[in-house]
Structures are given as C-alpha cells and as structure tokens.
Amino acid sequence: MKDRELTQQKILQAVDNIIANDGFERLGVNVIAQKAGVSKMLIYRYFGGLDDLIAQYLLSKDYWANTDIRAIDGADVAGSLKRMFREQIIQLRNDVTLRRLCRWELTTDNENIRQLRDRRERNGCELIKAVSGFTHSHHTEVAALATILSASISYLVLIGEQSSTYNGINLQGDEGWEQVIKGLDLMIDLWIKQVDELTNGQVNQLTD
C-alpha cells in the first residue's frame, strides 16, 4: 500500500473514532490530525479540507449509497432482497458511527448531507429499477415496499438504543432481531408470491 493511501486510511479511521466517541460536533482539522498522528496539511492536500473529508467519509459509510446493483440476482430476487435488508440490520446494529450518522442526518441540513442524500437516492432508484425489471412490477410498487422496509429497520435500530422493547420484541438482543427478520422475509415472500400470481395470470390470459 502506498504512503498516501495509508495516510488517507489513517485520517478516515480517525474521523470514525472521533464520531464514535464524541459525535460529529467534535470534528475539526486539528482534532482529526492529532487523532490520526499526521500533519493537518495532509488533510488539505489529500481531501481538500474538512468539508470534503467529511463528505468522503459519509459517502463511504452509508449502506444504501454503496449497495451494489449486482447484488440483485434476477433468478432469486426474493433471496437477494432478504440478504440486502438483513445486511442493513447487521451493519446498523454493529456500527455505532453509522447510527450516529443516521441521527445526525435527521437534525442536519448542509452540503455534505445533501450530497449523501443525492448519492443514496440515485443508487436506490437504480436498485428499484433493477428489481422492477426482474419482477415486471411497477417501480412505484417496488419503491413503496423498499421505503417501508428500509425506513422501518433504521427506526427500530435507533429506537432500540433508547427503548429495549417494541411491540413485545426485544430490540437489544439477537433473538428479537431474528423475529424482525422473519417478519421482513414474510413480507418479501408474500409480495413475490403476489407478483408471480399476477404475472402468471397475465400469461394465461394471453394464451387463452
């Protein structure tokens, strides 16, 4: 690994550590440089400044902004969707900085956040377009389902930090989250079943 790449990783890791321990409010060039053990001039040289550094960090952390469209298997759309939403749960539950990012976004509106939202929106729309194409469903239907599921996951993970139970489900334990995942899987299976029935019905009408 080149020295520049190593230094960039150290700086990004320093940002991650500061957010995890102190929150976004503590981020500053001097604090980051000290945490990374590098000259603050390298932050300007490699990232252009604090705002660009934060923007790059945010874009690297967000789950849906970085989900690869190739993760969707046209031969097993249901399985692909289940894996994607399960991975969202795993990442959010295991990454304190990602949870802090979610909370920060709810109370902040600046250029960095807008860039993140734009990137997430573009990628999300591409994912929805792919699922719509594979299932022959209208994109608005896919978008509604994806929005409900992804937003529900984010809310439950975040509320679980403050409240241990939601509708009798333990949000602070693996058993409770397996219960949530089973519910998500059921919704996806029922939707795919409906899609298949509608598709088969249309085919039968054409062949009658």
Residue map of PLM features:
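Alpha-helical DNA-contacting segments of helix-turn-helix folds
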Residues: 53-61, 113-116
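Amphipathic alpha-helical segments used for helix-helix packing
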Residues: 92-114, 160-167
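Hydrophobic alpha-helical connector segments
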Residues: 69-94, 98, 134-146
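Amphipathic alpha-helical packing segments from all-alpha helical-bundle domains
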Residues: 65-70, 109-136, 143-144, 178-182
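Hydrophobic/aromatic-rich alpha-helical bundle segments in the mid-to-C-terminal region
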Residues: 132-185, 195-199
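Basic, helix-initiating cap at the start of DNA-binding domains
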Residues: 1-22, 26-35, 52-55, 67
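Amphipathic alpha-helical linker/stalk segments
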Residues: 57-84, 124-130
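Short hydrophobic/aromatic patch on the recognition helix
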Residues: 36-47
